[in-house]
Amino acid sequence: MLVWLAEHLAKLYTGFNVFSYLTFRAIVSLLTALVISLWMGPHMIAWLQRLQIGQVVRNEGPESHFSKRGTPTMGGVMILVAIIVSVLMWANLSNPYVWCVLLVLAGYGAVGFVDDYRKVVRKDTKGLIARWKYFWQSVIALVVAFSMYAIGKDTPATQLVVPFFKDVMPQLGLLYVALAYFVIVGTSNAVNLTDGLDGLAIMPTVFVAAGFALVAWATGNMNFAGYLHIPYIRHASELVIVCTAIVGAGLGFLWFNTYPAQVFMGDVGSLALGGALGTIAVLLRQEFLLVIMGGVFVVETLSVILQVGSFKLRGQRIFRMAPIHHHYELKGWPEPRVIVRFWIISLMLVLIGLATLKVR
């Protein structure tokens, strides 16, 4: 919005051209989302407490979690508001990639909101029925996937980028839609599974978003894309603004979500953030990079799949409890230790992922 306004004001005073610079807009996008999130936090927490919208804790979970019962949840609303407002202010709104991410953020946020509402307001422990949750996730993902395919059909925007092989970039055709669908839905649910401890999901989300901000900048720059042997995608650079908004909103939320948490993001936050990261990865043609940088989300998801599969096939559990962060809690690790170690691993994986862009 401000980009469009600045273009017209620059005719009167050239100083307004600063609003067209990507680096400037990336910084102020981060700061805007951070300030909005920090400002909304106390008001959101107080409002949720008045409405008695508190976390539901399972009796079969770790005993240390019983003290979390009643902690305000659905705080992901403030994350989404901060991101969306910041992006609408600082991004070029004529860019279709920006709208693809915003659609997933809003759509998955709505699905998560209904799920949380049923759990904490209607006291329905199951929340939104699983098949309906998956149905709406699928509808939104397919709408966005087909839209992205229509935008980038038969261009580098629909090629598959394989790590370590600079000359292996097959054109996917309609398989692009299927891949986009699985990445968006899968990442959304992976972040949701990870969101089980104070600050555990939000910091890896911030790290991955920061990593993708760098990738988006390189992908949208013809010279750097050529240097790194990744596809040059014309619309990609504007995703930097989206990524930095996620970073800012995430850091602002962490202020209140760090141990011991004053508020939880709930499904409204985790489903939306995961879906956004998946969408960004698809738009940048970096699905494999997402697997590396988002390795914490991948391991959390695999631990659940392995646990359920092992119990159904052998009648035995691999872990004391899944997702795997609960396994370490039950081994006696204090919650802050689990959280910080997962953060460190996440940061390492993001750096390794970025390094793979050069190892080709």
Swiss-Prot record:
Pathway recorded for this protein: Cell wall biogenesis; peptidoglycan biosynthesis
Disulfide pairings: none
GO biological process, one term: cell wall organization
A GO term for molecular function: metal ion binding
Keyword Transcription assigned: no
Transmembrane residue ranges: 27-47, 73-93, 94-114, 132-152, 168-188, 199-219, 236-256, 263-283, 288-308, 338-358
Keyword S-adenosyl-L-methionine among UniProt keywords: no
Membrane topology: Multi-pass membrane protein
Enzyme Commission code(s) on record: 2.7.8.13
Assigned keywords, A-Z: Cell cycle, Cell division, Cell inner membrane, Cell membrane, Cell shape, Cell wall biogenesis/degradation, Magnesium, Membrane, Metal-binding, Peptidoglycan synthesis, Transferase, Transmembrane, Transmembrane helix
InterPro entries: Glycosyl_transferase_4, PNAcMuramoyl-5peptid_Trfase, PNAcMuramoyl-5peptid_Trfase_CS
Cofactor: Mg(2+)
Record's subcellular location: Cell inner membrane
GO CC, one annotated term: plasma membrane
Pfam families in the cross-refs: Glycos_transf_4 (PF00953), MraY_sig1 (PF10555)
NCBIfam families xref list: mraY (TIGR00445)
Function: Catalyzes the initial step of the lipid cycle reactions in the biosynthesis of the cell wall peptidoglycan: transfers peptidoglycan precursor phospho-MurNAc-pentapeptide from UDP-MurNAc-pentapeptide onto the lipid carrier undecaprenyl phosphate, yielding undecaprenyl-pyrophosphoryl-MurNAc-pentapeptide, known as lipid I.
Family: Belongs to the glycosyltransferase 4 family. MraY subfamily.
Protein name from the UniProt record: Phospho-N-acetylmuramoyl-pentapeptide-transferase
Record organism: Pectobacterium carotovorum subsp. carotovorum (strain PC1)
Gene encoding the protein: mraY
